[in-house]
């Protein structure tokens, strides 16, 4: 049985800091982030790995083996504080060996004449955008083991492409969404672990590797806490709709015209102007007549 000690602060032990690739310091320095913690797990014993390989008839890849020899699973969480309310947000999970179980038909489909996972093979071909890669099969052609249940948003799986006996070099990491469509993630477990850490365990981050992307709600969290080395252009729902593509040289073209000043005419004198103005021409008074004066 796996032990589940109480969560510890991320920076309390040096080996935990090494395990998280230093991402804890980034989270703790981010605004609003609180309660960054890791559930410390003991290393798996070698006989546990050998027992898993014998039980499942699969050889565990070397990087997966080395991971379990360092820690029997991984669980790191962090929360955000908004308006005095603490909201759990980030979650990074790698199942321990006892939970690294094969993905098989659920008991829900065990009723007579009920559809099986194998019946979805033809339908799932439509949802696979990785046409150059052979997708996993739910039947004996592939051996699929669950690494993370993604909080009910899908499943991250370790896939042995050629079924059993499973060889270590035939493994890949795939994401199975809620519609049971497969999406390729990485060639190796090490590459996937780096993706998990650099995406900070944000909700639904695996959907960034699908054709339909993350949900609008998840985009809001991605905008607030951008994953490390994340392509921010994916946060735009429809670039053609929301990105303003105006050409400034055309918009302000009319302002670049040379204005020709108009010529001004002579200034007319103002009647109320102070100071000496132009002299009016003299006016002659009418005379009574010429020659002798008139007698009464």
From Swiss-Prot:
One GO CC annotation: cytoplasm
InterPro entries according to UniProt: Knr4/Smi1-like_dom (IPR018958), Knr4/Smi1-like_sf (IPR037883), TPGS2 (IPR039231)
Gene symbol of the encoding locus: Tpgs2
Subcellular location(s) of the protein: Cytoplasm, Cytoskeleton; Cytoplasm, Cytoskeleton, Microtubule organizing center, Centrosome, Centriolar satellite
Record note on quaternary structure: Part of the neuronal tubulin polyglutamylase complex which contains TPGS1, TPGS2, TTLL1, LRRC49 and NICN1. Interacts with CSTPP1 and LRRC49.
Region listing for Disordered, in residue ranges: 257-296
Keywords per UniProt: Cytoplasm, Cytoskeleton, Microtubule
Keyword Repressor: no
Protein name: Tubulin polyglutamylase complex subunit 2
Main location: cytoplasm
Function according to Swiss-Prot or TrEMBL: Subunit of the tubulin polyglutamylase complex (TPGC). The complex mediates cilia and flagella polyglutamylation which is essential for their biogenesis and motility.
